[in-house]
């Protein structure tokens, strides 16, 4: 990935619905070159998908929480992940080093809803311990940074 690919990616990250024509004007490339580079990044897997980022509060999920999960034994990992993927309120799951095995990002409607999700998680086979943190405010939320662009 070179400097021009990074420029195109930065523009797409700002607005994935931006046309190749608009991008080409901003970074001074031909439209066909921009389209070709986007297609190459899609086929190579650099661009995995295009998605919609929603405001959780405006979609009814007023609470965001981070939950640390410790499993009793690694043999529970596969089943745990299968089950976590089925729950639409768990929007991210990270496998960790340290005291806990997983960190979940959860978006839910209320404290009661979070409590239901917490009980559901505790009922999964092999869950030994959980620790939950309420998010008071999100200060930064990006999905993947790009390395510093070099010309």
Where are these regions (language model features)?
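A compositional/biophysical signature of low hydrophobicity enriched in polar/charged and small residues
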Residues: 1-151
